[in-house]
Amino acid sequence: LRNMDYSTIYDEIEKNHNYNVKLPDGGIIQLMYRFNRTGTELISHRLGYYPSPSYELYQNDPELYDVDYIYGDILNKSVLPVIIRADYNRDPEESELHHPYSHITLGGYKNCRIPVDRPISPMKFVKFIMEHFYYVPSSQLEFNFEIEGIVAFEEHIAEKDINKSRIIV
């Protein structure tokens, strides 16, 4: 899906059902993890948030969204939809030579890889999206955040990324 316009990327993900959650406004959340054969070690993850490239749902039923402050920013015409991806690969040969083991990419910018100090759990990623893109305070999310501590990953950051601006999970 490289070098394609955003709506084509979104349509391919949607058409192939390559996502875990489709939000009421059409936004898509993708959570993909790969573990070793015994399921005890994380090998890689690819987490993504793809905002809807169209406001067709809103145009067909604006009252549905107007009453809900959660969608205020999402439906603002001056807001540009931005893909958020969080990738992790424990393989030092692939990761250290080209990019940090764990990083966040904003938009489709090839060289935008913001180092993250460790892999990101599904709960933390979904919470991040809901709090920062939908204005849903965690106190209003109906998740059991106590289980958030069950899935915790060890710090895994390359020496050369420690002095860079980075995100600490």
What are these regions (language model features)?
Residues 12-14, 41, 56, 63, ...:
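Glutamate identity and glutamate-enriched acidic tracts
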Residues 3, 16-20, 36, 60, ...:
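Detector for Asparagine
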Residues 113-169:
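Long, compositionally biased interface segments
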Residues 37-121:
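An exposed acidic His-Trp-rich patch
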Residues 1-42:
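Short N-terminal edge-element motif at the start of the domain
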Residues 5-6, 41-42, 52, 81-83, ...:
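Generic ordered-secondary-structure signal
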Residues 17, 25-27, 43-45, 78-84, ...:
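Generic structural motif recognizing short loop/turn segments at the entrances and edges of beta-strands
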